[in-house]
């Protein structure tokens, strides 16, 4: 309040909702309850609630966005797409958690930024906005697409033990 900002946009994740079943006709909505399944998603859900509490207590102009998986320029190198590209270009094994059938909705970073800009200028204070790409792919399909695009062999795929609390699908 002291800085007189016109609006605070809190960037969160769809992981705070937990896991969807594999029926691709259902998606998270702004009324889906928070059900995080990992310490990471629990920390994000906690931060969402903290932001909401500050907004209510101090009458702050706040929006919360919950987006799906981003991809695009300058992504952190440990994320699936840049990691896969780096490993393949160096003829190293690409780790795939479990059977690779985890489904993610992919959203280009430009589209995410565009949505944030719209919310900044037209969003209703206090609202939560879900931002998705309606572009669901399994992790294995993403990796195979990159491998084939670069012209390498699927023998570079190495299935590794799945992470604890790893949601099968969120979108």
State where each predicted segment sits:
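Conserved Rossmann-fold NAD(P)-dependent oxidoreductase catalytic core, especially the SDR/UDP-sugar
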Residues: 1-37
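C-terminal substrate-binding subdomain of Rossmann-fold SDR/epimerase-dehydratase oxidoreductases
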Residues: 82, 88-171
């Amino acid at each position: 309040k002291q800085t007189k900002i016109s609006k605070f946009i809190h960037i969160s994740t769809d992981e705070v909702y937990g896991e969807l079943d594999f029926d691709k006709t259902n998606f998270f909505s702004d009324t889906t309850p928070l059900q995080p399944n990992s310490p990471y998603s629990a920390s994000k859900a906690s931060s969402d609630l903290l932001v909401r509490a500050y907004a209510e207590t101090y009458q702050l102009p706040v929006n919360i966005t919950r987006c799906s998986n981003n991809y695009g320029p300058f992504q952190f190198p440990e994320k699936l797409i840049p990691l896969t590209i780096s490993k393949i270009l160096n003829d190293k094994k690409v780790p795939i958690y479990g059977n690779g059938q985890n489904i993610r909705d992919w959203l280009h970073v430009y589209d995410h930024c565009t949505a944030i800009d719209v919310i900044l200028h037209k969003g209703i204070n206090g609202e939560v906005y879900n931002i998705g790409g309606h572009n669901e792919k399994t992790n294995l399909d993403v990796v195979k697409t990159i491998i084939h695009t670069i012209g390498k062999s699927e023998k570079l795929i190495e299935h590794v033990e799945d992470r604890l609390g790893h949601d099968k699908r969120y979108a």
